[in-house]
Amino acid sequence: MKKYPEKIVVAWGEAISGNLEIRDWLMKNNYPELGLFCHALYFDKSASDWLMKHAPHLLATIKGVEGKKDAIRWLEINGFKLLAKVAKAADNDKEQMHWLMLNDKLFGVLAQRIKLVKDDIEEANNDVHRWGYE
């Protein structure tokens, strides 16, 4: 994975949490993969297609968060062990979250933010009051 400056990882976390201004800044300032990751989290097909071509490790991270074991294996086999841990942690693996918080807090916080987004999406999908209104 490309080595990102700490402030860019922090910005990515903010974008994941819904800061559209920062997401758009990432897109325009040589970090389109991080901005498109945010779109792909919300099932944007064109963003997922772009990630598949240009940053498959980020798409595999999203798929791993969604519980796809083959995506986690792909990350581990291809040298993206940290992203595999992020995906597992964001998919409710407490042991991986604990490891991240002890060993790479920046990516631990990133995993927490991804988990919150995915939990919100799942809650909305399960809310019978919202069915048919989106």
PLM ranges: what are they?
Residues 1-134:
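Ankyrin repeat (ANK) tandem alpha-helical domains that serve as protein-protein interaction scaffolds
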